[in-house]
Regions:
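Nucleotide-activated chemistry modules centered on ATP-dependent adenylation/adenylyltransferase
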Residues: 2-408
Length: 408
């Protein structure tokens, strides 16, 4: 009986070519596993394609709700953003995928897991750190790094290899954008984006969105509710988190929200440029932050921001299954105990504008914030506070004055 390998399978040219290569090189039975994180129509026809390519079995695993509830929500609650712009769409999905690959490998008694990530990107790190953290005994095969036995260097090479092994599928040899899509976002790399001096060709590029210039000329108001930091409804309709994200994607895409063009620092040391569409995610981050502003005290908000930056780095680097990520998430969850309320905002040509926030746990006090005199706040108290708060500055200034006098 042959040993088994679980292949992270997308149905694209790369992973299709890997199937006969694994059989030929290692004499494995190949169990393909396509993890559905919300990529939608990209899954059409996969079963037939995997069978024609020589796979022994195909799993199509729907983890959309797991992805939304256990990976997206913690990052939203933390407000984790990598390098101030990237909302971690691909980064969050990789540990969720790695976890399910390990579960299938255990179920099939597979000796190895194979992925098709290249040797220059971040995904190889994210997949392999996730797999290693959960199953250190399982072998990992990364064909694109095995240049002594993986000899295909272009799409043309892969198409020829497939045809030589009886796989004649309608793959296009011409290069196109490299895309990654899931419930949260879609990323675009390649073609004109490889030169940062080029403006993206948005007419050909965008999939989920329209540009702000082509968005409707009329603003649209949206109301959302949260309970303990978890989104619960849109415009009065309660939904599970994944459906809320889908609805926000529809609304945000319509109004040109969440299109970013960034040059980011990859884990492996090089810079890469990409255009990301994250319409729903951008709205969800903004709505959650809008509510938090009303509820969190200053000290907690300051520390939470520090934790958010660290969490974003951990997620980006593939360190989801680590004690530090768990500790940061536990802290963030504790801050969400009272993040309950309703936010209203309007969407207009790429912008999100606040239009009102309410919460039973609001720390905002109109009587304190106004300029009228109240029972809780005596304006005279500010004098003593300012004297103490500015004492270090006063001591330093007096010291410098004395030094200057002594030097004359």
């Amino acid at each position: 009986m042959k040993e088994k390998v679980v292949l992270a399978y997308s149905g694209g040219l790369d992973t299709t070519a890997i199937i006969p290569w694994l059989k030929e090189t290692f004499n494995y039975d190949v169990v393909c596993c396509c993890i559905d994180c919300g990529q939608g129509e990209e899954l059409d026809g996969l079963e037939e394609r995997a069978k024609l390519s020589g796979a022994a079995k195909l799993y199509i695993e729907d983890i959309v709700d797991d992805f939304a509830d256990n990976y997206i929500v913690p990052c939203v609650q933390a407000h984790a953003v990598y390098e101030d712009e990237y909302l971690l769409g691909t980064s969050m999905a990789r540990p969720a995928i790695a976890k399910r690959l390990v579960e299938i490998a255990r179920k099939e008694n597979a000796v190895a897991i194979c992925h098709g990530a290249t040797g220059k990107g971040n995904d190889q790190i994210r997949f392999e750190l996730g797999i290693t953290a959960l199953a250190p005994d399982i072998k990992i095969i990364a064909p694109w790094r095995m240049t002594d036995i993986w000899t295909m260097q272009s799409r043309e090479d892969e198409i020829d290899y497939c045809k030589a092994h009886g796989i004649d599928l309608p793959f296009d040899a011409k290069h196109s954008y490299s895309r990654d899509r899931n419930l949260w976002h879609i990323s675009h790399e390649g073609l004109e984006l490889e030169d940062p001096s080029n403006e993206p060709n948005y007419d050909d590029l965008l999939v989920m969105s329209t540009t702000p210039e082509k968005a409707p000329d009329k603003a649209e108001y949206v109301t959302m509710t949260f309970e303990k930091g978890v989104p619960k409804s849109i415009n009065g309709e309660e939904m599970k988190v994944s459906d809320i994200i889908r609805k926000l994607n529809e609304l945000g895409g319509k109004h040109g929200i969440g299109i970013i063009d960034i040059v980011e620092n990859r884990v492996v040391g090089m810079k890469s440029r990409g255009v990301y569409e994250t319409p729903g995610g951008t709205i969800l981050y903004a709505a959650h932050q809008q509510l938090e502003e009303l509820i969190l005290d200053r000290a907690t908000a300051e520390v939470k921001k520090e934790m958010a930056d660290k969490l974003a780095q951990l997620v980006y680097e593939g360190k989801w299954f680590t004690p530090l990520r768990e500790a940061i998430q536990a802290f963030v969850e504790s801050t969400q105990e009272y993040v309950t309320g309703e936010v209203k905002f309007k969407l207009y040509k790429g912008t999100i504008t606040k239009a009102g926030t309410t919460s039973p746990y609001s720390l905002y006090s109109e009587s304190l914030a106004s300029f009228t005199t109240g029972d809780l706040y005596d304006h005279h108290d500010a004098s003593g506070f300012i004297n103490l708060f500015g004492l270090p500055l006063k001591v330093r200034a007096m010291k410098l004055q004395n030094v200057e006098k002594n030097q004359k």
